[in-house]
Amino acid sequence: MISIIVPVYNTATYLPQCLDSLVNQTYRDIEIICVNDGSTDNSPDILKAYAERDSRILVIHQENLGLSDARNKGLESARGEWVMFVDSDDWIGTDCCKTLLSHTDKQTDVCLFSYIREFANQSFPQYLFSDKKMVYQGSSIHWLYARLIAPNDQELRLPGKIDSLSTAWGKLYKTSLIKEHGLRFVPVRQIGTEDLLFN
């Protein structure tokens, strides 16, 4: 099973598209954990309506504690072998979960995937790597570590690429890796970027 954690805060405009992309996954063995982080728009009503139609959706309500706390709350409820994060103003392709699982084996800890930045009149594909699949080991893993920790020269020149590796979304994580090591998101107010430290 894949646990999909969706932190929600005042994204009613985009939330239906996000949830539709999740409930319509071709890989059906998923749970969708939506953490409403104190939304003041009609996001809670949208979440309630979707949860009433699909038993795979769990809605958790909390006061507005921030993105990190919402993701951590979702992790507490995750029951899947795998976990992924989808922001509530994003959506994923209908074969996303199926495709990701097809690239995993018993030794996989995390599977990263590319994404598209959507704007009103343009789309910008963001490719993480040039190859379709890469396994990092030996000396090549040091390059990956450096990329996860800080932006490289190209990213500093093109800031739109900075989040390509450091985000929580765009990845399928082995749940046991997160839970056994007690990994959690540190609130952004403490470190400035919650995704980077988690990764």
What label would you give each PLM region?
Residues 21, 28, 36-45, 63-65:
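A conserved acidic beta->alpha catalytic loop
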Residues 83:
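Short aromatic/hydrophobic "clamp" motif used to bind/position activated sugar donors
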Residues 3-6, 33-34, 61:
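Short hydrophobic beta-strand elements that form part
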Residues 1-3, 21, 31, 197:
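Cell-envelope/extracellular polymer assembly enzymes that use nucleotide-activated donors
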Residues 67, 88-199:
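Donor-binding/catalytic cores of nucleotide-activated saccharide
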